[in-house]
Structure formats: C-alpha cells, structure tokens
Curated annotation (Swiss-Prot):
GO terms for molecular function: DNA-binding transcription activator activity, RNA polymerase II-specific; RNA polymerase II cis-regulatory region sequence-specific DNA binding; RNA polymerase II transcription regulatory region sequence-specific DNA binding; zinc ion binding. Residues 1343-1355 have a biased composition (Acidic residues). PROSITE patterns: ZINC_FINGER_C2H2_1, ZINC_FINGER_C2H2_2. The modification Phosphoserine is found at residues 36, 42, 161, 175, 180, 231, 970, 1122, 1134-1135, 1140, 1167, 1174-1175, 1219, 1225, 1320, 1475, 1585, 1598, 1653. It holds the Pfam family zf-C2H2. It is found in: Nucleus speckle. This is Ras-responsive element-binding protein 1. The modification Phosphothreonine is found at T1315. GO terms for biological process: negative regulation of transcription by RNA polymerase II; positive regulation of brown fat cell differentiation; positive regulation of DNA-templated transcription; positive regulation of epithelial cell migration; positive regulation of lamellipodium morphogenesis; positive regulation of mammary gland epithelial cell proliferation; positive regulation of substrate adhesion-dependent cell spreading; positive regulation of transcription by RNA polymerase II. The keyword Phosphoprotein applies.
Length: 1687
C-alpha cells in the first residue's frame, strides 16, 4: 500500500482533511501520540497494511512467480511457495522444528509452518474491511475488532481500541519500525508511512528509508536486510535511557518528553521527509474534526505527535520546527507558540473562541482550577529532590485548606493531614492533588473508563484540553465512589458545587494559584506539579512519596477505607486513622467491609498512585509504556496513559488492570481463596484457581473426552490434536461440565489437602500429593528410601513429579502415543511393602477395612473431588449437597481373592449411583457389569502404578504373607485390598492373593479374575481409601486417585462397555496401549509360573503389579488367574504385570518395571516350557511392543486371537492371564479392542491404513505409523500375518508342551495345573509366548530374513526385526530350551523349519531365514559388541548394541553366548540369554525404539511398509536412527565404547542413563536386603522389570533409553530367559550364570534383574557368586525371581 504513488496519497489528501479525518475516524481508534497510522493512501482504503511485511506481501503478490530460496523452484503463487518451502522442513524428519531457510528453531511443527509464511511472504488472512493481511487468523481477528466499533463513535470507542492496538503492536512484529507504526493500527495508516509519504516527490518511487541512517532503499527487503546492520544499536533515549522497540517510538518519546525534534545532518528539523515519522493525521480520529475545538486539539496533538503531511494540496507545515498540522488554524495556533517563545512570554495561545476561553476561565476559577497555559510551567524534567516531598507536604499543609474535621478528627498536624491527603487519592482527596487540578494534569486528559477508573490520557504536552478535561473531571467526580466524600471545598462555590463534587474524591479546592512551594519533579515540562496534579493523584512531583512518608498512599488509602468502612468515621478521618496506624491495619485487609469500599480505595489509589506516577513518567519521559508501546499510536490519545503501580515498578496500560494489581498489594481483593492464601485479581482468576483445589476440569474435549481447567487449553488441544481449525468446529467440540457451587465449595473446604498421616494441612491437593511421597517414600518396612514415586514404564527412570515423568516420556520415548502416556507413568514408589499397608492403614484404613488402618481417613480423603465430587472415604459423609457414591469399607471384599470393584470408585467419583458392598463383594462384583462402567482413561490403563505400588507394598509385606496372601494376601485386609485394589492393565484389580506363592495360586487367579472383570480401571472411593492405595505412592500419585481433576477421560464418559470378555480385551487393550511400550506388555505377560512358591511371590507381585497388565490382558482374570494360580502360585504373576510387581514389590518401582518385567518375569515364571515372551498374546504383544516390530506385533495380536482360541483349546500350557484375555476374545482383537476402548468415545477416529487401530488424533496416528515404517516388506508382512496366526497356534502349542514342560522343569507343576486350568488363557499366553515367540522368532526369522534382506535396505527395520527376531529367537531358544527342558517345549513349537545353528524350529521359512540372519549378524555384532555373544544372541544384542552400544557389548556377550552356543549351550544361553537376551532385547527394544520408537506399539498388525523416515544411517550396519544422538549412541555398539562406569561394580555402560539406572540396582539391592530375599528377588525383578521396562519402552532413542536398552535387552533376555529359562532355568542356570557372569560381569545383575524368567532365577541362583556381590539387589531380586521361576 505504501507503494501507492504519492498521487494516490495526494488524492486522498485532496479529499481534504475532513475526508481524511472521517476516514480516520472510521477506524474508530485514537492512537496516542505514537499511533501514527501510515499515511492514508486513500479514504476508500483507509486500512492499508502499514507493515513492511504487508507491503512485502503485496509486492510479492504482484510478482508472477516466486522462487524457493533453497531449491530455486519457481512457484506461481505465494501459497505454493509456502507449501513448497514447508516441505523442505519435513524432509529432515527431525523433531527439532527448525526452519530450513533461516535455521530458526520453533517449538512445534505448527509454529514452524506458520513461520514459513515469513519466508514465503504469504499472509493468508485478510481483513474484509480494510484489506490488511495477516499471517495468523488470530491477528486478523484482533485487527477486525477495530472495525467492529461504530466508525462514527470513534471517540467513544477510543479507550478500548488502544488496548487492542497496543496489543497488536506488541504482539505483531512487523518489519522493524513498521511494527511500531502498525501499532497505530488505524486501518488508514497505510504503508504510506513506510514510503516517504512525507516526501511526496520521493514517494513516487516508494523509497524506503533507514530510520537510523536514513539510507534509501527501493524495496522493503533491502531495507530489512540493511536494518540488520543496525541490530546492535539499541533504540535508547540518550537522556533517560529508556529503550524502544522502534525508531518511531524513540522519536515520539524525544518529541513528547524531551521536546527534541529529529534533525538532519545540517541540524535542521527533519520531520516531513523523515520516513520514520508516521504519515497522515488519521490518528486524530479520536475527536471530531468538525468541532470548534479541533484546531486547538489538532495543534496540541500534532505538537506532541509528529506527523508528516501526506498531501501536497494540504500541506500545513511549520517552517520553524517542520511539524505538520492537519489544518491552517492548527498551524497558525502553533506558530503563535514560536512567537511567544521568541518573545520569552508564554502568552495563552489564542483560542479560536476567546469568549469560550473566558467562560472556561471563570468556570475553572470556581472549581479552583486554572489553565495550564495560564500557569507558568515549572521545569519538571529535573527530578525533585527527595525533600521535595517534605516541601510539598509542607506547602500543602500551609496552602491546602483543611477540612475542619479532617485534622481535628485525628488531631493530625496540618502537615500530617496534608500528607494524608496526598497519600489518599479518592479518600480525602489528596490535598496535594487537589491543590491544583490544572487542566494540564489532564495534559493526559482524564478519561473515565467504563469501570469508573480514571485514566490519564496525555493529550498534548503543550496545550491543555480545556473542555474535555473539565468534562472528564466532572465525570470523574460523579463516578467517584459515594463512600468517598470530600469535605466541602474550602474555596469551592457553595453547596451546589460541593454537592456535585462531594463524591469526587480528589478534587479538593485549592488556591487558584499553583502552590509556589511545590517543586515539580516529573511533571510534564509545560506544567508544574500543581497543574499536573490530577484528580486522584498526589502531585505527580512526588513519585510515590506517600509511600515513603506514610506506609504508602495506597496502603493508607486502603486502611483509611477500611477504617472508614469499619468505623464509619469520615473518610478523611478514616484516612488519617489509617495513616496514623500505618500498616497496622493493612493486615486487616480481609476485613474490608465491601468490595465497593475496596474498589473505591483502589480507584482512589489507582488514580492517585498511577496518576502520580504516570504523570511523573509521562512528563519525565519515563513513559516507558508510551515509548515502549508504539501501539500507543494506534491507541487513542489515552492510549499512552500508563498506570504505574505505586508499590512496585510495574506499569499497566489499563486502570482496571492496575486496580486489580493494587489489590494484590493491598490484599484487599474480594477474591480470596478460602483454602489457601491465594488472592485473585478478579473473579475469573479465583475460579480458575479454585479449580486447582477442586480438581475441576469443566471444559471437556468432546472428541477424546480429555478435561481441561481452562477453555483456552481445550481449544488449543482441539486445534493441535484434532485438527479443528475453525472457531465453529472448536466450539462445537468443547463441552462445559459445570459443577454445582456447593460441590465446589465443598471441594474447596474439603479436607483434601490435609495429610491423613501427619495431619498437616497442605492447602493444595498437589502439595498434599507431593507431601504424601514423604510418607510413601519412608518404607514402613524400612525397605524403601524415599523413592521418587513416578517411574517411566519404558526406562524405569524415576521422577518426583508426574509431570516430569510425562515430560520425559514425551522427549525420550517418542513412540509412546500421547493418549497412552499416562499408562507409561508408573507410580512405582508405592509405600514399602510394610509401608503401603501402614500408610494405607493410616490413610485408607477405613476403606481397607483393616482395623488397624481404620484409624486414618481413607485415601479418598486425600483425593480431591473430581469435577466437584469429593473423594471421601466411605466413612466420611459427603457434603450434604454433594451427591457422592459412598462405598462402605465393607464394599471392598476383604477376601483378597476378590478383586476390588474399581468401577464403584468411578461411580463414586462420577456420582453414578450409590452402590452397596454387594458391588465390591466378589459375587456382586461378578454380577456387576463393568461393561456398563466407562473406562476411565484418566486413570492410567496400567493401573500398574497404583497396582504395582500396592503390589509392591503388599508384596514387600507379603513375603511373609504371601503364603496366605494368595487368597488373603495378608492378615490385614488393607494390604489385601491394596492388592485387589491393584488393577490389572485392564483396570481389573489384582488381588493381593496373587502375591501368595504357590500356596494359593488359584485364589489369586480368581481375584485376578474379579479384577479382570473390573476391566474399568476406576478406583472406587473405597479402593482409593484402601490402605494399600494410600500406602502406595502410586495411588497417591496415581493420576486416577489423586487427581481431583475432572475425570480426565471423564469417569462419567462411558468407555466401551467392558464385559467379562471385554475386560480381557479392555485389559489387553490397556495392556497393548500400555504395552505400547513393549515393557508393559512384557510385564503384563503372564510371568512364567516358574517355581510355585517363588513364582507365587513373584507372581503375586506380578499379579499385583503385573496382574494389572495381566488383568488387563486377561479379560477373564478368573480363567487366567485360575490356571495360573492352580498351576502355579505365580498365577498372579500370570499377569505379566502382576508378576512384575512382585519383582517390583520390593522396590516399589518394580511395579512399573514389574509390569514390563512382569511380562518377562511371567515368561520366566512360566518356565514351564512356555516362552512367555513368545507365548500368549501378551508375551507376543509384549515382545512386539518391546521390539516394536510391527510385523511381530501384528502376529502377536493375531496370535493372541489365535492363541485365544488355540489357548482355549490348548490352554493347559498357558495359565497366564493372557489366556483369559485371549479366551475372552482374540488377544489381538482384545488388544486392539482394548486399545480401541480407550478411544471408543472419541468422535474423531482416524484409522491406521496398515492395521485396525484407530486413533483420536492425527499426531497419534502419525506416531503410530512409525511402527509400520520398520515393518518388513509386503511379503514379510504377509508372512508376519501368517506368523501372527501361526504364532498363535505355536504359542498355543508351545505353551502346551513347552510351557508345561518348562513349568515342570522349573518346578512349576502347579503352574502346569494352573496352565491346564487356565490352559486356554495362560496356556495360550505361554504358548503365545513360547510359541508366539518361537513363531515370532520364526516369523521374526522370516521377517528377519525378509528384514534381513530388507534389513540391508532398511537396516533399522531389519535390525529391529532382527532384534525382535533375536529376541524371539532367544525366546524361541528359551522356549526351545524350555521345550527341551520340558519335552513339550520344543515339540509344542510347531516349527517345521529348524535352525542349523541353534536347532530352533520355525513355522515360517521367513522367520527361520530371519533367525538365521540374526545368527549371521550375531556373530559380527558379537564381535563388534563383545565378540562373546553367540551368533544367535549376538544379533539381538547387536541391534541392541546399536541402540545401546555401551551396554551392547556386555549384552551381546551375554546374549551371544546364549545364542551362539549349541542347543545345550543354547539352554544356558537361553537361560543366560534371557539376561543377555534381555539386554539384547533391551537393545533391540531400544533399537526398535529408535527405529520404531514412536508408535511402534501402536500398530499391532500393521507391517511396516512405509519408507523409513529415519535419516541417520549407521555406516557400519546401515541401521537407521531418528537423530544423530541415537546414531552416536548406537555407534558405541560398534566401537565398543562404554564411557560410563559404575563406581560400585566397575561395570561400564554406553549410556549415562543406563549407568544411572544400573546404580539404582545397587540402591535397590540395599533396600532388597531390608525386604528380605523375596523382596530382593522382587527388587531385582523390579530392576529387570525396570530394565525391561526401559528397554521394552523402546527407549533406545535416549541415553536413558539406550541405557535402558541394555537393561531392556536384559529384560527381553529375561523374558526369553523366562521362556527359555523356565525350561532352562534349572538346566541353564549354570550356563547362564557362567555366561552372564562372563559376558556381563556387571550386567549379569541386570540381565538377571529379570528374575521373573526362570532362567534368570536359575541364573541368579548360579550367579549369586559373581553377580550378587556386585548387585546385591539384583542378586537378591534376581535370585528371588529366579527362585520363583525355578520353583
């Protein structure tokens, strides 16, 4: 627009100033002096974009083609260019969101896309009124508000517009100066200003001038490029050192504050040709140009706000100072000022209407006012000496009339009274401020804001605005709060005037003459303070002197107010009182009687403090705001009015904001939180704050049902996650769920912030949660040090805060779908075994039903109400108005075999209905249809956190209890409830009975069943109350329990109904979703019911912790658990999670790990010949997830289905929960369905093109798609599909033979029984694992083969597959070993193809070929890594190595020996392999994590058929990585570099995180010692679980991941170990120990950390000599786990 020729500008000017003014007025905004809309090109086009950016855009649009700066591609439109250059960014495939053109790094892809508009010049959003274009819709809409105001009511709307304008200016950054100019957003401010609109001649060429050196440029780009040379020259005022964003702001500041005009090199005024000066007078639109006063107004305004003439016809420029005026009269008036200055007289400037002036004078005299022009201005630029205050006060004392009662009331000395008056604004108006209400104070005219706040609007520095000011004054007086009445004016006219001004706080009559004694400090140069004094201010000359003299004028005022309101004394008296007792009364702020009083005080204060300061600042030139806000131009004159806080150095643009701010200082805000000491500035802020206490999240996304406390967050969520672009779509998808005020009140008053253990009132629920960790961390059993309660399911990294863990997952585990992140945060740090019960007893005793625990309020007491519902213990009566479902403690089955009914919790929270104990009772539980209960997505699918925590505590305690714990976890019901409370992944509670060793395998299974039925992971209030929950930090920290927030996925929102069958699915789904991190699945997998007794413990733990996943996995806990329990005490372990929890139990974190580990542990436990990893859907899924191999995943899912059927048919072998789930429905279906369950309610469903998975967010699908990127070729995919199916059968078969045998071998006769009972489910799972793993391995081999073939092509994929395959192979081997150990193990594997190297047989040739390739790679990798790894395991480790090079060598060594050795060796390997394999698996998982790191778990079936987007390729093995960091870590697997060394055991690690995690093993070991052998075993299991978790989590990507990868590999190995180890545990214990010891002197512990695998157990048994010394905990935990497995 600037480009428009001067002619156009002229034309617009020709239209005459009137036209211009009218056009300007249509803008409806008054820009303060600074707002200089660019010259209006033409009235018709008033709002041309005045930004250089816009001009650029327009110039660009004029071009016929646009060239890409990167590839020179020619685009015909800017939009094409935008879309094209955006592609350059996506090509990098990185996650750093950096611009490929300028390298700028942005926070998100959307920000980067928006940023690209800068380079393309496209401004897609255009104002329909004025045509201005914007890069963002928000900016355009903000701009549109300019036009929303009535064009004719520009004056009226002026005040609001400044705000917007200002915001615009500050927010929108246009090209350098243009930005500030834009701040005068008057649409009329065309780009003319940018062009030399002043130089009409030059304008013809549209020349751009550098505002610093005035160099000319023909295009904006040239100017912008040139401006970069001045980037280091800050725009700073040489006089007052204030900095400005734009040159224009600096010019305006100098002209207004320092009266310095820009000058050219010759020293002559340089305004009209200065491109930095805004062109045009449209900013004068704030007043009617037809008004008689317009000449004077425009003269005064133009003297302060420099403008350039746009029209040659209408050029009214002063020859002396080069200032331009819109009309001749204005110029004439202005010239008089020069004449007067020359004469040295400051004669009043001739007013167009002298008569009016006289009238005004008389009127003002009556008011005790006088024109500033009549008062000889005292230089105000020199700051007043501090004693000025005293002087001023003294003068006031002398000159200001005192109200008779004023001083007398408090017997204040006149001086005091004066000071009081000064300090009080609206109160007895400051005598000072009243001393002169010269109009000038209105130099910034007072504008009465709608809120009755007074805004000082600097109008002109040199002339006063008489009428407007008076009107404002009157208005202000009228608006003054009635309470603040002024004493009669001493010199005021009689009653009438007094009556008028009675309420006008500040206007107290003063002598007409300015006090001679007053020294102006920062008054505007032209005025003396007296003149400046504005209505409510003390003389500006006293900065915040009142503060110094008195407690603070504001405070005094507030006190006075308080006194006033309280004592009813005259405001003045009150004021004095307050002043006298300075801060004494401030504390009584709350005592302020009414908000009115507060408001009036604040108003008084605001005007007073803010005005005093404003004037000082404005006059002084500390108008930072003015200068700062070039937007001021856009804003009406009042725009420049800044409101500085009297108590601090903050400056506000609006009096309302200042008022609210002052309240915060005075503490008189009526909006105070009744729970904590928070004082809100306004009601909305208080409401938002209260939600932090109530946990209310009223705004719910209708698509995914995620709740938000603030609507803006929900809107952003819809835009980013659901791609809702339009306001209509967004509004349509936001649901507001209001909760009754009573609920909120109750919530706020509820004792949800009081610690039930120590009675401390934490004020905030969040603080309580954090505080509870101190109790949870104290292990009552003395076992746990205060551990960080939140653990990453993927890498077992521990965090003190959940948000930190979530952040970690977002950053490190990119494969984890956002919707599943909650499930990856494990509340690992439950109370110690003893601790949990104790804590629960104290916290949840009532609910738990444990008499001992009964003393304490249920945990629910700690829980904040969700959506206004309080979580209360059953014993606590809900507030009368809050309808809460009370769940009697009895409602929770004391029988630990009975699962807790979490659905009730959900009900309680949701007010579904009050249900009686029957719900909780097992019988009622079964009848209870979980399917009717919504799945609470807000509760992590793995209730593992809580479950594991619960399990852990109970387990820790239950080592003794475990015998009886199965059915009755412990004598104390509380622990039991905690166990039952533990939910399976499916949300089913895992009953503590699981912990019982072999003693009660079946009963635990039943509880599992019960919990499984409770597929809905909802903690009932009772559950919440249950001591275990309380005790477990997991619960406390558990989002579900602790979060008072509106149910994240609102509990109210029904999730897909979960029937008994569904629960398994739900469980599976949850498991899968949680398994999205393979670790979860692994853990969720049934732990091989290794040793019955040990297994029982482990299983119990697992059952608790792992059970959760298992439960989730196991739709029918009964079926799953029963077989497990009956066959093996580890039946609970059959839930991988449950098993894992056992391991976790000791550490508490093991729960999480246990989960993942649980999967592996279960496989170990199921050493009965079934490779848990390869057996059962869960194992398969776990592996799939761990390996993140889409192919494998799909097969596993299918296998799960097949296994479900097959398992049902051949259930005997697999007695794990998976079988139940499988029985319930095909594991795959269940997994998928479970996964789907999470989003069933989502309105938006995006289906994965490669698999059945559905995602609510595009980002989730995107992430998930990565799981398909590593998948094998289509053939492989087909093979994978076949594998999946075959895997199922294999799993079934394998588990039957291998699993059973393994179990037998492992001493899991009970497990066999359990397997037989749960054969279908568990057998399926074990088969699924064993077979699945073998088939998987076969498939993996085939896939591997395919991948191997394609591996070269897709090294990353292949390696992932290979790793997966290797893992599967290891599992296979383990399974085979198990099979060998248990005759059925190998036989059950219907492997028609046998591996020449390891003798393993595979169903699919592809699997076999991949398996062989794995061997082939293994050797090299082993050589690379440790050279010790056998070919078979080596390959797995190798991938892991690649992913986690540091640990790879050891892992490779471990796994290699297992893999490479002969079948006998193989068994040893398998046994050891689990450890090594685990490391390999971990590595593999890690690699996969790297490879598939994002959604790898997301797509169960989809085979990766997409091109690998990982751009970083390993030059050695061609493996691909997402980031250079991952590649660097991976290279360590080739270089053998292990830069991190454990100081305790000298073990070295590739990744720092691995070292950190490893060191935790030592810490845990110490804890484990406290907990006892079982605890140690559990702990080690936990570690393994952690490792698995870590690796399974596909954490290879991060160092943590990498480090975890070895651990994960170990876990994987362990899983395999579990599989193999179950069979080989006894056989290969020695081998494994030897190998692990040899291969991983220090890793053994980790490798063995997966004690869940029988092999691991065996190994641990054997290893104790070498490894246990190094890792006592590992040894202990592993030993325990192994013992369990061995049993």
């Amino acid at each position: 627009m600037t480009s428009s020729s001067p002619a156009g500008l002229e034309g617009s000017d020709l239209s005459s100033i009137n036209t211009m003014m009218s056009a300007v007025m249509s803008v409806g905004k008054v820009t303060e002096n600074g707002g200089s809309p660019q010259g209006i090109k033409s009235p018709s086009k008033p709002p041309g974009p005045n930004r250089i950016g816009r001009r650029n855009q327009e110039t660009k649009e004029e071009k016929s083609s646009y060239n890409c700066p990167l590839c020179e591609k020619i685009c015909t439109t800017q939009h094409q260019l935008t879309m094209h250059i955006r592609q350059h960014n996506t090509d990098t495939g990185g996650a750093d969101h950096s611009c490929s053109i300028c390298g700028k790094s942005l926070s998100s892809a959307s920000s980067l896309d928006r940023h690209m508009l800068v380079h393309s010049g496209e401004r897609p959003y255009k104002c329909t009124v004025c045509g201005q274009s914007f890069t963002t819709n928000g900016n355009m809409h903000r701009h549109m508000k300019i036009h929303e105001k009535d064009p004719n009511s520009a004056t009226a709307t002026a005040p609001p517009s400044p705000l917007k304008r200002r915001r615009l200016s500050s927010k929108r950054k246009l090209s350098h100066d243009a930005e500030s100019e834009r701040e005068d957003p008057a649409p009329a401010k065309k780009m003319v200003e940018d062009g030399q609109s002043g130089d009409l001649e030059k304008k013809a060429d549209e020349v751009f001038h550098c505002p610093v050196c005035f160099k000319e440029f023909v295009c904006k780009y040239g100017l912008e490029t040139h401006m970069e040379t001045h980037s280091d020259n800050p725009l700073r005022c040489d006089i007052c050192c204030v900095t400005f964003r734009t040159h224009r702001g600096l010019l305006r500041h100098n002209a207004l504050v320092h009266k310095q005009l820009p000058r050219d090199a010759m020293g002559r005024p340089f305004i009209q040709n200065n491109p930095s000066i805004p062109a045009g007078f449209h900013d004068l639109g704030f007043t009617d140009f037809s008004c008689r006063k317009f000449p004077r107004i425009s003269q005064a305004w133009c003297e302060t706000n420099l403008r350039r003439c746009i029209s040659e016809q209408h050029r009214f420029v002063c020859d002396t100072c080069d200032k331009a005026f819109p009309m001749l009269c204005s110029l004439a008036l202005h010239k008089q000022t020069h004449v007067a200055a020359d004469q040295g007289q400051e004669k009043p400037q001739a007013t167009p209407l002298p008569g009016d002036a006289l009238d005004q004078k008389g009127f003002l005299a009556l008011l005790g006012l006088q024109h500033t022009k009549d008062v000889r201005p005292a230089p105000a630029e020199e700051p007043l000496p501090d004693d000025n205050q005293a002087i001023q006060l003294q003068t006031l004392k002398c000159q200001l009339p005192q109200d008779p009662g004023c001083t007398n009331l408090l017997s204040l000395s006149p001086f005091e009274a004066a000071s009081l008056g000064g300090s009080l604004t609206v109160l007895p108006a400051t005598k000072d401020s009243i001393k002169h209400l010269s109009l000038q104070p209105f130099q910034k005219g007072f504008i009465i804001q709608p809120d009755s706040s007074i805004v000082v609007k600097p109008i002109s520095g040199e002339s006063a605005i008489e009428l407007a000011d008076i009107q404002q004054i009157l208005k202000m007086a009228a608006s003054a709060p009635p309470q603040i009445s002024l004493p009669p004016f001493s010199k005021a006219p009689a009653a009438p005037l007094q009556a008028i001004f009675k309420h006008m706080p500040p206007l107290k009559p003063k002598p007409l003459v300015t006090p001679r004694t007053v020294v102006a400090t920062s008054t505007p140069p032209p005025l003396i303070n007296a003149q400046q004094a504005s209505p409510g201010c003390i003389s500006p000359s006293l900065p915040p002197p009142p503060l110094k003299l008195l407690k603070g004028s504001v405070e005094a005022a507030s006190n006075a107010h308080l006194l006033q309101s309280k004592s009813g004394t005259q405001p003045h008296a009150a004021t004095r009182l307050s002043l006298q007792q300075p801060r004494a009364e401030l504390p009584g702020q709350p005592e302020m009687k009414t908000q009115l009083e507060q408001d009036s005080i604040i108003e008084a204060l605001l005007p007073l403090s803010m005005e005093a300061k404003i004037k000082q600042e404005i006059t002084e030139g500390e108008l930072k705001a003015f200068m700062t806000a070039p937007g001021g131009k856009k804003t009406p004159a009042m725009r420049k009015v800044l409101y500085p806080c009297r108590f601090c150095n903050q400056v506000f643009a609006f009096s309302g904001v200042l008022r609210a701010h002052v309240r915060s200082h005075l503490g008189i805000s009526p909006y105070q939180c009744n729970i904590c000491d928070y004082i809100a500035a306004d009601k909305a802020a208080l409401i938002r704050h209260l939600r932090t206490h109530s946990g209310e999240r009223p705004y719910i996304c209708k698509i995914c049902h995620y709740p938000f406390t603030v609507k803006a967050n929900c809107e952003r969520h819809l835009r980013k996650k659901h791609l809702k672009a339009t306001r209509k779509d967004i509004e349509k998808n936001i649901e507001y769920v209001s909760s009754s005020a009573a609920e909120l009140v109750d919530a706020f008053c509820a004792p949800d912030t009081v610690c039930r253990l120590c009675g401390e009132d934490l004020k905030h629920y969040r603080a309580l949660r954090i505080h509870m960790r101190t109790h949870c961390g104290r292990g009552l059993g003395g076992g746990h040090k205060g551990r960080k309660p939140f653990e990453c399911k993927e890498c077992s990294a521990a965090f003190a805060a959940k948000r930190n863990c979530i952040h970690h997952i977002l950053k490190q585990h990119l494969h984890v779908p956002e919707q599943d992140i909650e499930s990856y945060v494990l509340a690992a740090d439950g109370l110690g075994p003893a601790e949990a019960p104790a804590a629960e007893a104290s916290g949840r005793g009532e609910d738990s039903g444990c008499a001992a625990l009964g003393d304490c309020k249920p945990l629910t007491a700690f829980l904040e109400p969700q959506n206004g519902f309080l979580h209360r213990g059953p014993t606590q009566p809900p507030p009368p108005h809050v309808s809460i479902k009370l769940e009697p403690a009895s409602s929770f089955a004391v029988d630990f075999n009975e699962p807790l009914d979490f659905s009730q919790k959900g009900l309680a929270l949701v007010q579904v209905k009050q249900e009686n104990i029957s719900f909780l009772s097992p019988s009622s539980l079964v009848p209870y249809d979980c399917s009717m209960e919504p799945i609470d997505l807000s509760i992590p699918k793995n209730f593992r956190k809580g479950d594991k925590d619960l399990a852990t505590p109970s387990e820790a305690k239950k080592p003794e209890e475990e015998a009886g714990s199965s059915e009755q976890p412990s004598p104390c019901p509380a622990p039991g409830p905690s166990l039952p409370v533990t939910l399976g992944p499916s949300g089913i509670l895992e009953s503590p009975m699981a912990p019982a060793p072999a003693a009660t395998p079946e009963p635990p299974a039943q509880p599992l069943q019960g919990p499984v039925q409770l597929a809905v992971p909802i903690y009932s209030s009772a559950l919440v109350s249950s001591p275990p929950l309380v005790g477990s930090s997991a619960l406390l920290s558990g989002t579900a329990l602790l979060r008072p927030l509106r149910p994240k996925p609102p509990l109210l929102l029904p999730k897909p109904p979960v029937t008994e069958e569904l629960p398994p699915l739900a469980s599976i789904a949850q498991i899968i979703s949680s398994v999205s991190s393979a670790p979860t699945l692994l853990k969720t997998k049934v732990a091989d019911p290794g040793p019955a007794s040990t297994g029982s413990n482990t299983t119990a733990s697992d059952s608790l912790g792992g059970s959760v996943p298992k439960a989730a996995t196991t739709a029918t806990p009964a079926a799953t658990t029963s077989p497990k329990e009956s066959s093996e005490p580890p039946a609970p372990a059959s839930s991988p999670e449950a098993a894992s929890p056992t391991e976790q139990g000791p550490a508490g974190t093991s729960k999480k790990r246990g989960r993942k580990r649980g999967m592996r542990s279960r496989p170990r436990a199921n050493s009965g010949g079934v490779d848990l990893d390869s057996s059962g859907e869960f194992a398969s899924i776990e592996k799939m997830l761990a390996t993140t191999d889409t192919n494998k995943f799909s097969p596993f899912l299918q296998t799960a289905e097949d296994n479900t059927q097959d398992e049902v048919a051949g259930a005997p072998a697999d007695h794990h929960g998976p079988s139940d789930e499988e029985q319930g429905s095909p594991p795959e279906d269940k997994l998928l369905r479970a996964k789907r369950n999470s989003y069933t309610n989502c309105l938006q469903k995006i289906t994965c093109p490669h698999c059945p998975r559905v995602f609510p967010w595009a980002s989730s699908l995107q992430r998930h798609m990565l799981t398909h990127t590593d998948s094998q070729s289509d053939a492989e995919t087909a093979a994978a599909a076949g594998e999946v199916l075959d895997l199922t059968s294999r799993d079934r078969e394998q588990p039957s033979e291998g699993a059973t045998e393994l179990r037998q071998v492992a001493g899991d006769a009970p497990v066999e029984q359990a397997t037989a009972e749960t054969a279908s489910p568990v057998h399926r799972e074990e088969h699924g694992r064993g077979e699945s793993h073998e088939p998987e391995e076969e498939h993996g081999t085939e896939e591997s083969t395919g991948d191997a073939d394609g591996a070269e092509e897709d090294a990353s994929s292949n390696q992932s597959l290979d790793l997966d395959f290797a893992t599967k192979l290891m599992d296979f081997k383990l399974a085979e070993g198990d099979g060998e150990a248990g005759a059925g193990g190998a036989a059950s594997q219907e492997q028609k193809l046998a591996c020449d190297t390891c003798g393993k047989s595979f169903k699919f040739l592809g699997t076999l070929s991949r398996h062989r390739k794995a061997h082939g790679r293994q050797e090299p990798k082993d050589e690379k890594g440790d050279g010790a790894s056998t070919a078979e395991e080596g390959p797995q480790p190798a991938p892991e190595q690649e992913e986690k090079p540091p640990e790879t060598p050891a892992e490779v060594v471990e796994s290699a020996p297992g893999a490479g050795e002969a079948p006998a060796e193989k068994l040893a390997e398998e046994t050891e392999g689990p450890s090594d394999g685990e490391s390999a698996a971990e590595k593999r998982s890690s690699e996969k994590s790297d490879d598939d790191k994002k959604p790898k778990t997301d797509s169960p079936k989809s085979v990766a058929s997409k091109a690998d987007k990982r751009k970083k390729v390993c030059s050695v093995c061609n493996k691909r990585f997402w980031s250079l960091q991952d590649l660097t870590r991976h290279m360590r697997s080739h270089t053998g570099e292990r830069p991190y060394k454990c100081q305790t055991c000298e073990r070295t690690f590739t990744l720092k995180h691995s070292l950190v995690r490893h060191q935790r093993i030592h810490q845990k070991a110490r804890h484990a010692k406290h907990h006892g052998k079982d605890s140690d075993k559990e702990e080690r299991g936990e570690e393994d679980s952690e490792n698995e978790s870590t690796h399974s989590g596909n954490n290879a990507v991060s160092e943590n991941e990498a480090e975890l990868a070895p651990n994960a590999s170990n876990h994987m190995a362990v899983t395999r170990s579990r599989k193999e180890g179950l069979a080989s545990a006894t056989k290969d214990c020695s081998h494994r120990e030897e190998k692990v010891t040899a291969g991983w002197p220090s890793e053994p512990g980790q490798g063995d950390l997966n004690p869940e695998s029988p092999a691991a157990l065996g190994q641990d048994l054997l290893e104790p000599r070498s490894k246990r010394p190094a890792h006592p905990i590992l040894a202990t935990a592993d030993g325990a786990s192994q013992l369990v497995g061995m049993e």
